[in-house]
């Protein structure tokens, strides 16, 4: 390491020889020429966004529904119970707490990097008791301020600050993503449980139908009008109905336990709150919960994972700048202002002193291979971040398009399912009318009833699929994340 030093103490004149001035001037010119390393970050972002498709390759949403702010999307469900459960889950969610801790750690890192790049001032105090040439023993006391500063010649410190701020923004986006996922998970569990109860009602009606058929066949078997094998089959069908009901009831109870774990509420309190929930939304209410009219590049900017990948790319780009800055000389200076007192041998002297220097210009000579290796590693991290950003963009577009395809398919199934439910309902009413006048037996009536119940079960399952698909689209669209307010909303 080579150093150039100049020192002044208790004088206003700074002395340095002409060769030192020349070396300093040449070094500063070299540094100025190398300080303007062009940043590739903006060009990389523009190139990756231009590579996106100019339009969505997926069916549009039905009825071209009105665009709604995603931040207020849960209010469209008009379900205060759901809103309370989401709030409770977000308050207790460990993933949100972990993401929040990452935000605080990133903020602390920003503060540390910013302070490290500024002039440092410390209060110092010294006490020395020792013999001197003139006196056998003396005490020297001093107190004052000591300052030091490493000059940011080509922006390495500034790049470190920008990288730390990018990490902070990335952590903030991660916090928003965690909140969106917890809200979606809670909503899916909530509607999953309520639709499970509706499915349980269908299964319970099916069990009752099978048991009525079994009892009818037992009576006719005893009267000699039904073969024993037919009666045995009816009893087996009734047992199967009881088995399905018990299985469905267990599924519902398990889902309720999951909701208890998510929200932190006691089970009796949660059951009471669920009993006050409004009716489930119908297929008609789900026709236009969201619409996607904007271009892909505009939509995916609202996703926290895309914003996080952008900030990671920026941090990697600034890391390249920092690693390159370490290869060049650094300039530092220091100084102090002191109040001194000497006493000993009957002498008591008080005086003030100050110093400026040394000015140190240092250039690493040995071990530069390690610095070059660190610069190469920073370049590799930047390339990896660029690839990750491109992959995040592609995955974001794919998730939105997959959600749109799912919505289109489910919407097409609504009409067919409604037709099936209506047809089986008409058949059941006709069979009941025939049964009342003796033109149909009980077995025919119960078979028509079971077909109707199966259609009802399919309708409930379709409703659950549609609700889950809407929630998936909400997550795919970013869940109301706004990069301009990524940190202020916390």
Cite the ranges covered by each PLM segment:
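Periplasmic alpha-helical coiled-coil/stalk elements that build and connect Gram-negative outer-membrane
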Residues: 157, 173-295, 406, 410, ...
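Small/polar-residue-enriched beta-strand and adjacent coil segments characteristic
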Residues: 80-81, 85-88, 100, 107, ...
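Amphipathic alpha-helical coiled-coil segments
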Residues: 96-99, 164, 171, 189, ...
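Alpha-helical heptad-repeat coiled-coil segments that mediate oligomerization/polymerization in large
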Residues: 224-227, 396, 403, 438-441
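Hydrophobic, well-ordered secondary-structure elements that form the walls
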Residues: 333, 361, 378, 385, ...
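N-terminal secretory signal peptides that target proteins for export/translocation
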Residues: 1-17
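Terminal intrinsically disordered/low-complexity segments used for targeting and assembly
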Residues: 2-4, 21-91, 165, 249-301, ...
